[in-house]
Amino acid sequence: MTDRIAAVKTYLLDLQDRICAALEAEDGKARFAEDAWERPAGGGGRTRVIGDGALIEKGGVNFSHVFGDSLPPSASAHRPELAGRGFQALGVSLVIHPENPHVPTSHANVRFFCAEKEGEEPVWWFGGGFDLTPYYAHEEDCVHWHRVARDACAPFGADVYPRYKEWCDRYFHLKHRNEPRGIGGLFFDDLNQWDFDTCFAFIRAIGDAYIDAYLPIVQRRKHTPFDERQREFQAYRRGRYVEFNLVFDRGTLFGLQSGGRTESILMSLPPQVRWGYDWKPEPGSEEARLTEYFLADRDWLAGQP
């Protein structure tokens, strides 16, 4: 697996570079600061953070490559046969929180796991996806996001986008609120049903599609005027983001349980957030429309080319 792991690592480092360059160019003011770190138990990474920009209030694009003698519970719970195997985990994970409430928060992740034991075949799989969390949503943005997702999946089979779109809707769901985190996208894990080269090609297609999915939405919305009321609603909805990441997100749990770097793991949290007791938007308002119309399991591409 050594050559394969090296190829995945080379791709992920290049993906991090390309995404950071594209986001810096779009912001026009802020620059990523890099923090290279080492994990005492094995491995390390490159954390890159950006903030206080013309566009991005806070964001990060992380690369990590960690390894150890046994998988943490979050990774082996649904695959108990892997308990006791040594592991390597590589990935790029990013979250972008724009200042303007009309520009959605975006998240993307692509990752590779390999669990090995002497005398046995290595067990490997890929995972990843991308999802969008709008505050003041627009249907054309949702359609564009999902169209890019569908087109990235298309060469790998007509059933791939619908399956991973539905998985995304299921995964990014706040059970205690009974509502989705955003308008979805793609999510998949344990991907090894194809041969390695095909799985790796799929991961590259998804990683490369993120900028194509996100930047046109950013460019359409970043100059939209906003007021303090809209910023307060954005902070309120960001609370849902925090709740999901700290309670349900498998990547966060894996990172914390495997002795990962806390600062990098919690990079995904927004800079300003608020909770109001039993707050509800005014009926018929833009804020109410988010939950009533957009935050629903919906086929955004129905009737679309």
UniProtKB/Swiss-Prot annotation:
Binding positions for a divalent metal cation?
A: 97, 107, 146, 176
Binding, substrate: 93, 109-111, 259-261
Q: In which pathway does it act?
A: Porphyrin-containing compound metabolism; protoporphyrin-IX biosynthesis; protoporphyrinogen-IX from coproporphyrinogen-III (O2 route): step 1/1
Which cysteine pairs are joined by S-S bonds?
Answer: none
- Where does the record place the catalytic residues? 107
Region of interest called Important for dimerization, as start-end residue ranges on this chain: 241-276
Location of site Important for dimerization? 176
The processes (GO biological process) annotated in the record are: protoporphyrinogen IX biosynthetic process
Q: Which domain of life is it from?
A: Bacteria
Name the predominant localization: cytoplasm
Cite the EC number.
1.3.3.3
Similarity comment text for this entry: Belongs to the aerobic coproporphyrinogen-III oxidase family.
How it assembles, according to the record, is: Homodimer.
Protein name listed in UniProt: Oxygen-dependent coproporphyrinogen-III oxidase
Origin species:
Pseudomonas aeruginosa (strain ATCC 15692 / DSM 22644 / CIP 104116 / JCM 14847 / LMG 12228 / 1C / PRS 101 / PAO1)
